[in-house]
Amino acid sequence: MNSMLNPNAVPFQPSPQVVALPMQYPSGFSSGYRRQRDPAFRPMFRRQNNGNQNRSRQNRQRLQNNNRGNNRNRNQFNRRQNQPSQSMSFEQQLLLMANETAYAATYPSDMQNIAPTKLVKIAKRAAMQIVSGHATVEISNGTEDSNQRVATFTIKVVMN
């Protein structure tokens, strides 16, 4: 009947079913953020009920200072626990790590003909340059013009 009155009318089509999707926040935006605000939060009337703003600012500062102190103590405690055993000197530990890195290194196929002990020495020298941080030592052949150089090191330091 509608179509008779209105020649341009489209025959009745049900609206597509809308399935409720969970809200997707942009990355780094926590969903808990919305819950912290009181439901009557209205940005236009924000300054309605905060009394003396200066006093509240001082209180906030005091709270921050308390937290800071607590964190400092906790960090010192952790540092004391995490200290490496003093039985082995730092250089020895570094040498050990260098050995492990050297043996774990993978060498390109064109370097397989070099004596493995020499390769390990090269890798160890490279690993000794890494004092902190996890690193992968890639060993590649020297450039064509410098044949006397056995290998060049590219040391990637990966932050943990």
From Swiss-Prot:
Which family is it part of? Belongs to the toroviruses nucleocapsid protein family.
Main subcellular location: virion
| Superkingdom as given in the UniProt entry | Viruses
Record region (Disordered): 44-88
* Full protein name: Nucleoprotein
**Pfam families attached here?**
Nucleocapsid-N (PF11030)
Question: Which residues lie within the region annotated involved in nuclear and nucleolar localization?
Answer: 31-60
Presence of keyword Nuclease: no
User: Do you know which InterPro entries this protein is assigned to?
Assistant: Torovirus_nucleocapsid
Q: For this UniProt entry, what's an example GO CC term?
A: host cell nucleoplasm
Cell location: Virion; Host nucleus, Host nucleoplasm; Host nucleus, Host nucleolus
Sequence ranges of Low complexity compositional bias: 46-83
